[in-house]
């Protein structure tokens, strides 16, 4: 392990021990805010500190065993020789774990997200594919125990969606889905195609971390135009007969959001405002990512929705992720929600990329 990394780990261990002492002091216990803040810091430092303590212990064991190798007692020397390989393997494993712990954490990883799927080129087939993608994400979300909340939907003329927006809530949603933003291309024979020709169409997906309720972004009410309209529901006994749907336009940027899912205008307005804040923040973050991308490629992408990331080839049952040259012949499983087949390799590559960066900068 590099000296610079060991120094960083030593500092983290010392801080962990210091915070542990502070948490036992009466003055800290009496101050709820400080106690809560230090408890959170202690919990964050605990895994890496305990791992580093195990690493130091293993290194000390290795030093002791190397000394025993020089012993005149042949039995002791033989025993030490047998133990050395085991301890060396332990050190290698702990070294790897420590490097993972040192990877900078994405502050958005624990957040809920807004998912937007929009039909692109390809007309009706693109809208149908947008529906297929939304179903894939919904199935995956259900398998993770996440909640899915529809915000708005514009239905395609022959099925699927021209655009659909939903909020997905649960544990570490953004950490799992942040690699999905970009253009998704589909190659398949449409049901209306009598000649059996393969058509190509595309959809764009945007994954945006939800803004905190404590207002990560300030919006001047004077910059908003708020319109109400009648929700375009499917009809039936619960048909929406009031102007409960909300459309909010942020005048300076031209960003427009709509929400028609709830029957209450108040609830639709609250959802639309949350989505607006998320979109405005996402636009700012995307701008920063594009600037960073000039110096460093990122698997999470630049935020450019036109960046083609994946192809779904139905005749061959093949999915290709172009960012890491990943090809999987389990397309039907993936479309049924087994998205881990794609997400896990992307996460591994992303972490390897971060580890390489860590090595370069240290």
From Swiss-Prot:
Its main location: cytoplasm. One of its GO terms (molecular function) is translation release factor activity, codon specific. GO terms for cellular component: cytoplasm. Keywords: Cytoplasm, Methylation, Protein biosynthesis. SMART domains: PCRF. It is found in: Cytoplasm. The modification N5-methylglutamine is found at residue 237. Methylated by PrmC. Methylation increases the termination efficiency of RF1. PROSITE patterns: RF_PROK_I. NCBIfam families: prfA, PRK00591.1. Peptide chain release factor 1 directs the termination of translation in response to the peptide chain termination codons UAG and UAA. Belongs to the prokaryotic/mitochondrial release factor family. This is Peptide chain release factor 1. It comes from Legionella pneumophila (strain Corby). The gene is prfA.
């Amino acid at each position: 392990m590099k000296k610079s990394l060991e120094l960083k780990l030593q500092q983290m261990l010392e801080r962990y021990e210091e915070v542990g002492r502070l948490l036992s002091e009466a003055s800290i216990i009496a101050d709820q805010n400080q106690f809560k803040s230090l408890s959170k810091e202690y919990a964050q430092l605990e895994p890496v500190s305990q791992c580093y303590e195990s690493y130091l212990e293993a290194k000390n064991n290795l030093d002791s065993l190397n000394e025993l190798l020089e012993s005149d007692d042949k039995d002791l020397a033989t025993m030490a020789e047998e133990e050395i390989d085991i301890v060396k393997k332990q050190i290698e494993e702990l070294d790897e774990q420590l490097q993972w712990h040192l990877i900078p954490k994405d502050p958005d990883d624990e957040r809920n997200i807004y998912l937007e799927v929009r039909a692109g080129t390809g007309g009706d087939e693109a809208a149908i594919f947008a529906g297929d993608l939304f179903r894939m994400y919904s199935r995956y979300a259900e398998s993770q125990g996440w909640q899915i909340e529809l915000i708005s939907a514009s239905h395609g003329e022959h099925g699927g969606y021209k655009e659909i927006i939903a909020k997905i809530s649960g544990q570490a949603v953004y950490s799992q889905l942040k690699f999905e933003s970009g253009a998704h291309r589909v190659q398949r024979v449409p049901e209306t195609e009598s000649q059996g020709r393969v058509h190509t169409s595309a959809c764009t997906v945007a994954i945006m971390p939800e803004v905190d309720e404590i207002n990560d972004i300030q919006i001047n009410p004077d910059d908003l135009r708020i319109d109400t309209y009648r929700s375009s529901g499917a009809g039936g006994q619960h048909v929406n007969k009031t102007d409960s749907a909300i459309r909010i336009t942020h005048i300076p940027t031209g960003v427009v959001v709509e929400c028609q899912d709830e029957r209450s205008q108040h609830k639709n307005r609250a959802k639309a405002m949350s989505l607006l804040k998320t979109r405005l923040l996402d636009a700012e973050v995307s701008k920063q990512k594009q600037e960073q991308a000039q110096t460093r490629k990122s698997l999470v992408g630049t935020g450019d929705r036109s960046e083609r990331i994946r192809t779904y080839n139905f005749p061959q049952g093949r999915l290709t992720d172009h960012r890491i040259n990943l090809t999987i012949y389990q397309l039907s499983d993936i479309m049924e929600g087994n998205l881990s087949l794609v997400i896990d390799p992307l996460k591994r590559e992303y972490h390897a990329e971060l580890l390489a960066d860590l090595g370069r900068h240290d």
